[in-house]
Amino acid sequence: MARKNAQAEDLSNVEFETSEDVEVIPTFNAMNLKEELLRGIYAYGFEKPSAIQQRSITPIVKGRDVIAQAQSGTGKTATFSISILQSLDTTLRETQVLCLSPTRELAVQIQKVILALGDMMNVQCHVCIGGTNLGEDIRKLDYGQHIVSGTPGRVFDMIKRRVLRTRAIKMLVLDEADEMLNKGFKEQIYDVYRYLPPATQVVLISATLPHEILEMTSKFMTDPIRILVKRDELTLEGIKQFFVAVEREEWKFDTLCDLYDTLTITQAVIFCNTKRKVDWLTEKMREANFTVSSMHGDMPQKERDEIMKEFRAGQSRVLITTDVWARGIDVQQVSLVINYDLPNNRELYIHRIGRSGRFGRKGVAINFVKSDDIRILRDIEQYYSTQIDEMPMNVADLI
């Protein structure tokens, strides 16, 4: 997979190629899926599989170990959700699949996608995350859950307490594996793995493939199929990107107020770089009598869930947040993203913006830039070979 002499450096830049025997299956119909799963996929609004879905679903369903290098916005969650649902034996009321992810939000998101796609299959899927009631976990797991989606610490705790029985587990999914390692979950992932039956199939999804990840794949996997979704398939296509030049930081606020009526045509997400800025901006918008909701990593879990629920249901139309939201949280109606602050790195840009026009849905992104930000913006533009123009007056017509 990597040239030997590259072992010492970060392997994320090594040419990671898709395995030669990977077939591209162009439609969901051609994947030989269960009838009720297929109906669930179409009911969810999917029409055509994304690049990663065309390549990964079939090998996973066939039981192969798979390493997929893919970022959010590629349809990765639905990729393994569909594969899991196809592989399940719903008549067996035991945990057969375990999904681990780096954040509570993502674990919940995965559960929602699985339940939505498996709506006609009578599937049981439980979320196992910290900050929730232990008794509830025990009751739910006792009842029998086909799939458990959770964060590594809580899942390991449940296995150790023998509340989560692993004897029927046949698949382990590691989503955003690089993020899990960044958050220090390496030990817990290894701990969980040790409790699983030896023949467990492993599916690993990661945006980058640093040495630690490759080390993990060599320990957990047998002859894995590799699937790389190149960045050009992480689309900024169909997303119109603009910038508004402001001379001073304070002027961003006035610009946002001017845009408020445009924002509420659909639903909008506004990104700030810090939690303090989110709180400050939310407060200031409310003082000016604008209705907004906000979310960041310091809020209690319950509150974050509540806010996400309202936003998903369309009860709140403008959400101010930090990058905690940008990874893997999918709200289909969002067609406008505003970077109140330009992100601190190029990858975050596609995580924030690449959400709004998923799978052919159109979107608009507006970047607020001070003069010293223009350089960063041009760098982003070049990196993704995309175009970011000055915002036109009629921006409302584009949304």
Swiss-Prot record:
Coiled coil residues, start to end: none
Enzyme class, broadest EC rank: hydrolase
GO molecular function terms attached to this record: ATP binding; ATP hydrolysis activity; mRNA binding; RNA helicase activity
Disulfide bridge partners, by residue number: none
A GO cellular component annotation in the UniProt record: catalytic step 2 spliceosome
Alphabetical UniProt keywords: ATP-binding, Developmental protein, Helicase, Hydrolase, mRNA processing, mRNA splicing, mRNA transport, Nucleotide-binding, Nucleus, RNA-binding, Transport
Any Pfam family matching the protein: DEAD
Motif (Q motif): 26-54
InterPro entries for the chain: DEAD/DEAH_box_helicase_dom (IPR011545), Helicase_ATP-bd (IPR014001), Helicase_C-like (IPR001650), P-loop_NTPase (IPR027417), RNA-helicase_DEAD-box_CS (IPR000629), RNA_helicase_DEAD_Q_motif (IPR014014)
Superkingdom per UniProt: Eukaryota
Keyword Nuclease annotated: no
Recorded family membership: Belongs to the DEAD box helicase family.
Function, as annotated: ATP-dependent RNA helicase. Core component of the splicing-dependent multiprotein exon junction complex (EJC) deposited at splice junctions on mRNAs. Involved in exon definition of genes containing long introns, including the rolled/MAPK gene. Has a role in oskar mRNA localization at the posterior pole of the developing oocyte.
Protein name (database record): Eukaryotic initiation factor 4A-III
Species of origin: Drosophila melanogaster
Biological classification of the source: Eukaryota, Metazoa, Ecdysozoa, Arthropoda, Hexapoda
